[in-house]
């Protein structure tokens, strides 16, 4: 099968980071395209994902570590974390050369010793987190609505971008795995199932050398999927697991498995936003549970597109997982981060895109339909009304991001209604 490279938003981030640092570390889940993206800008490569190369490199590390770093620059060190001492060698080499764009490192897990090592690279290394493809990157979004332009104050005339809900169900189950975007039908859907199987059978054992039960990892992923896009505690997840796991299970065990899955970049929870408010409501600080890609949730539950169409409540939560994936990628391209908001009065906002310059946008995520859209608009306007604009700016814009809709448009009250298949960074 011939595959052409589909440009990634990370291409721009990598180019920018290389221009100002001696080395750039690209992290993210396996199969998300880190190595392929790095190859577009590297001039030589050390492929430690190849067992033969790894064996020889381990021997060379004892004799002459510097030899592994020789080659045209930027030099790509793929799966660097398999030889953690390489980090110090690269850091020292960057100090010695005193030049930018020397090394690109990629890794799909964080080993304990590597985790400690990473902190020693301050100032020499930049970090980029890659995720599976957004719909814009995979070609399923036209990109006619730009978040950057909305932040710059641009309004939009009604733009046609019709989407079929069944197509969104398929894209949710397929996920943004680059290889899957070149495939179709059930063959494309298989990729997510293969990914989950690889994680529970191999990766969760190898990430830190701790022996874990594959079936328990499966049960945890299923419990996480049932609670995706919700602010639930570990104790709630444990209770859900116990209904499917007759073995003794404590909260520490649940936390250990979740920590391992976070190190593998499988799970990526959404932190709470903490704005200045005029109200006395207490802000809830619990994370919202999310996967790095919604297909992990659907595959863990054994769901396909038809299953989502027959259970719109679950579909809505898994679609929110997809929207969070895309918005996180877009946020990083805009020097921003994504958060969620919820307070003691029950007021909530699915996502808040907060940029480094202090500007932010409030974004609700809905499947679509007049009632759900109106509910989203009401929540956005209520949250905007309690933000203390004497201490922080008002939102740059508010948006309801939908799965379906014939048009992207701006309502008379200023709120944007945008189908996700129209959106880009």
List each model region and its residues:
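Conserved catalytic/switch belt of AAA+ P-loop NTPases
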Residues: 87-111, 119
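Short glycine-rich substrate-engagement loop in P-loop NTPases that contacts/grips substrate
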Residues: 45-74
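N-terminal pre-Walker A segment at the start of P-loop NTPase domains
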Residues: 1-15
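Hydrophobic anchor at the beta1->P-loop junction of P-loop NTPases
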Residues: 26
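Domain-level recognition of nuclease-like catalytic cores that cleave nucleotide substrates
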Residues: 401-425
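Interdomain motor-coupling "hinge/lid" segment immediately C-terminal to the ATP-binding subdomain
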Residues: 115-230
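Conserved lysine of the Walker
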Residues: 34-35
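Accessory nucleic acid-recognition modules appended to NTPase machines
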Residues: 181-359
